[in-house]
């Protein structure tokens, strides 16, 4: 799969098929793959033992019923709580689907650590590394010039510097997406992916048909959605009408 391609409206399953299954679970990822998603998306954090685990929030209260944080728990406890390791997610995806990693820690060399773990499993060509700032993009590009890097940047004005640093894909939120913001984020001919839903109200990944059609009309290159089957059906319908 060409993870940098433009114009195909890639469907990325946000935390897996999280509309119908527990987010970041094996079941959610398997369902997303079975539905035909182009990529699955997951969040990457470090345990107290230094192992990479997949969970969106810093703690496990919302999905596992404990307010303990990933960072303070050892591997044994996280495994008992059925939190997937990054290595587990990569094996689920191997030879089946691309993977977008949302790297939740903001220190400069964190993407390098994650890239080394991905490379150890021989999966680097199937992974998009989602970084939080320009410094992370620069560090990863220096370590792995061929890595595909997406920017989960808070400030859209940082995208030009992000691309100079080696970034390849711009991510915008749906509620800040219009023709002007897309053109600015593209900075020439870079792909733009959209996290659907709203930035601050807990609806990330949620979207209806009318809003999906608006994004298609804006020639967005990828969408992060909780229910990938809806976006896939609309993409197929649009392609058949072309």
Give the ranges of each region predicted by the language model:
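Phosphate-group recognition and catalysis centered on beta-loop-alpha active-site segments
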Residues: 1-242
